[in-house]
Amino acid sequence: MHNQLLDRSTTTPAAQARHSSRGPEGGRRQFRVSVSGRIGAPPVQVYAVIADYREHHPRIVPPEYFRRLDVLEGGVGAGTRTQIEMRVLGVTRVFEQVVTEPQPGRVLMETNQDGSAVTTFTVQPAGTYAATQLTITTDITARPGLAGFVERLFTSAMLRRIYQKEFARLAEYMDHRAHFGLVEESLPWL
């Protein structure tokens, strides 16, 4: 099975940033970065890789940005707690996330412990069940004023770049697993 982001229009996943109105945090604004693309593997297999923070998820995050991804609790799906160390443009940031599954097998969410960012992975069939349409969306609470404006511009661009690399790594990882017969046909926890 060949995995890639299909056709020229989706080779680089479609991305958008949306800015919303003032939030409840004293003038802070919410903004969204969303990237979608097609992966040439069944949704159940793609979801299994994304939801497994012990074995698979660390292999798809771009190592040039993600220095560490440690599982503090759980490890697969809802209830997983992670600590992540990221380095972007020379700045290192460590934060904890909690994983929930509003729709197990289809929607997985990572929420920063302080609530400042929520990343949602949405997996659905792309045409047939042999391919997946994956959307990664992050909703972020920005600071007010000029600092928040700069933060929105910078963060939107960086997240798009990170997610495009994550898509490429996921497609390559799914190819590797299919080539060596390492895919699960069903997942008992779904």
What are these regions (language model features)?
Residues 27, 109-165, 170, 181-183:
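Beta-strand/loop substructures that line and gate deep hydrophobic ligand-binding cavities in soluble
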Residues 39-41, 88-90, 101, 140-144:
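Beta-strand elements of well-folded, non-transmembrane domains
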Residues 30-38, 44, 81, 94, ...:
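Intrinsic-disorder/low-complexity, polar/charged segments enriched in Ser/Thr/Lys/Arg/Asp/Glu/Gln
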Residues 81-87, 107-113:
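Short beta-strand segments that buttress and anchor functional surface loops
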